[in-house]
């Protein structure tokens, strides 16, 4: 039934809004909805072809009804496509402002997936097939958009070097906090000196010095 696939895209978009990350791009579903739009457009042209530009809806109510249904289906599919891509674009911009490098996160995830799959390459008898780690959760257009938006944001932030425009608008409750290191990040320079971020270590640091690292997933704030 026309419109069902477009509704699936809307459901994906709604779920994306409640996630902290960006789920995989629905390439096949988007292509199928776009193909449905083209098919409906061909149906419109086929229905209008016999009239050679002199169609009168009052004289051909059945044809007029078919044209209306096809046209409304096309418009709805287009709105679903636009809504899906708009939500993903807003999520990319949100992650960019939080300082999360989506492309770098994908590469790290892909490397982990590849390592986990090596042990099971010879176990064909199980019939299980893992997802390729090389698959990107972004479309090529989204990757390009993220790079260009990141560059634009960096240029914009460069005008105010003394102000962190991507920082939280809410002041921290405590000036210093306890954190646990989730991933090795090496040494970082802070106002109070150099701290070494080694995985599983716990530190008592100034909130402003590690706020970005918490957002990027390197650190976890302890209650």
Swiss-Prot record:
GO terms for biological process: DNA strand elongation involved in mitotic DNA replication; double-strand break repair via break-induced replication; mitotic DNA replication initiation. Signal peptide: none annotated. It comes from Emericella nidulans (strain FGSC A4 / ATCC 38163 / CBS 112.46 / NRRL 194 / M139) (Aspergillus nidulans). GO terms for cellular component: CMG complex; GINS complex; nuclear replication fork. It is found in: Nucleus. Component of the GINS complex which is a heterotetramer of sld5, psf1, psf2 and psf3. Pfam families: PSF1_C, Sld5. Belongs to the GINS1/PSF1 family. Keywords: DNA replication, Nucleus. Residues 122-139 have a biased composition (Polar residues). Residues 110-142 are annotated as: Disordered. This is DNA replication complex GINS protein psf1. SUPFAM superfamilies: GINS helical bundle-like. InterPro entries: GINS_A, GINS_bundle-like_dom_sf, GINS_Psf1, PSF1_C.
